[in-house]
């Protein structure tokens, strides 16, 4: 049975996005990590923010330190949580506004 509305595990609709679950990030992972840390802000711990995003504290720490490449699923969750564009999260360009 084919579902016409594909969704990620956390129920965010893909809306026609045809990209592998892991994207090729050409930007500096440390810079991406700094932007993820900026989105988390000072009011949430890594454990709390990880629960919101559906990842563990250790994995979130790896993303923030630039030791792990963020998945498309994580980028979509960051966008949904923060309203920041995926372009800004990945490249730092295009402003942090909504897409």
Where are the predicted features?
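A short, Lys/Arg-rich alpha-helix, primarily the initiator
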Residues: 3, 7-42, 52
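Residue-level "edge-of-site" marker
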Residues: 63, 76, 91-92
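Short amphipathic recognition helices of helix-turn-helix/homeodomain-type DNA-binding modules
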Residues: 88-99
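Short alpha-helical DNA-recognition segment
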Residues: 41-65, 81
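Short, Lys/Arg-enriched C-terminal cap helix and immediately downstream tail that follows
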Residues: 39, 72-73
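DNA major-groove recognition helix of helix-turn-helix/homeodomain DNA-binding modules
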Residues: 73-88
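Positions in alpha-helical segments
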Residues: 34, 58-61, 73
């Amino acid at each position: 049975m084919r579902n016409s509305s594909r969704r990620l595990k956390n129920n965010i609709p893909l809306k026609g996005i045809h990209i592998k679950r892991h994207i090729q990030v050409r930007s500096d992972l440390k810079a991406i990590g700094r932007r993820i840390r900026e989105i988390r802000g000072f009011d949430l711990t890594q454990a709390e923010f990880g629960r919101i995003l559906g990842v563990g504290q250790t994995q979130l720490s790896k993303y923030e330190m630039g030791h792990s490449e963020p998945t498309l699923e994580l980028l979509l969750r960051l966008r949904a949580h923060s309203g920041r564009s995926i372009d800004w999260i990945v490249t730092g360009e295009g402003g942090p506004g909504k897409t």
